[in-house]
Amino acid sequence: RDLRMSRGLGDVYKRQIAASPLLIKAHGNATYMLAMTIFATSMVLLYAASTIYHSICHVSAKVLRNFQKLDHMMIFVLIAGSYTPVCMIILGGRIGYTLLALVWGIAVAGIIIKGLWITCPKWFSSIIYIAMGWTCLPVFTQLWTDLPHAAFGWLLAGGIIYTIGGVIYALKLPVFNALHKYFGSHEIFHLFVMGGSVCHFIFMYHYVI
């Protein structure tokens, strides 16, 4: 586990470096800089929390549970962080900032729920994550109009990949867990999360800034 921790934190460090081009490209525009800082920070926090929780050992059950809470809470932060540049830069105005307030409000509520009820069923957590992720459905037409089709494709692909991962996480189907002793639905879920992050990073870097 110590080796996994070292490798995992190294991966987080690489992600932090990978996020820096967003900030470099956004430099000079205060709105872009703020939005991209929030997005990049949310991504780093999610992967840092996940790495620590899945790597720590020789700690009490209470400490482990607290890190589990942090891991789950950061999912809400990443979702809201991913919405931030879309709301502030692409949508803007009353619609953009209303949606921004809504998703961050859901994030705060989700963090409170996880803090008080970490043992809630996986399907319940997944429903909240997925519903929050698709809060943008009412503005889909505007996004399709305002964005190049390739940009909309990357944005949509990220959402779909995240959603598939969430469904796999919730269902925990035996077919996934029977394939390998140390690689099951939970690990597949993490792969889909990384895939969604890559899609949204490409979207942010090439089309939002």
Q: What do these predicted regions represent?
A:
Residues 172-195:
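Interfacial loop-to-transmembrane junctions
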Residues 14, 38, 45-46, 52-53, ...:
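Hydrophobic residues within membrane-embedded alpha-helical segments of Major Facilitator Superfamily
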Residues 50-65, 108-124, 170-178:
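C-terminal ends of transmembrane helices
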Residues 2-13:
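Short, small-residue-biased leader/transition segments that mark boundaries at the very start
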Residues 124-142, 149-171:
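Alpha-helical membrane segments in multi-pass integral membrane proteins
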Residues 17-36, 82-99, 139-155, 199-209:
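Helix-coil boundary and interhelical linker segments in multi-pass alpha-helical membrane proteins
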Residues 61, 73-95, 108-119:
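Internal transmembrane alpha-helix with an interfacial aromatic "cap," most often the third helix
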Residues 14-16, 69-83, 126-140, 187-199:
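Small-residue-rich segments of transmembrane alpha-helices in multi-pass membrane proteins
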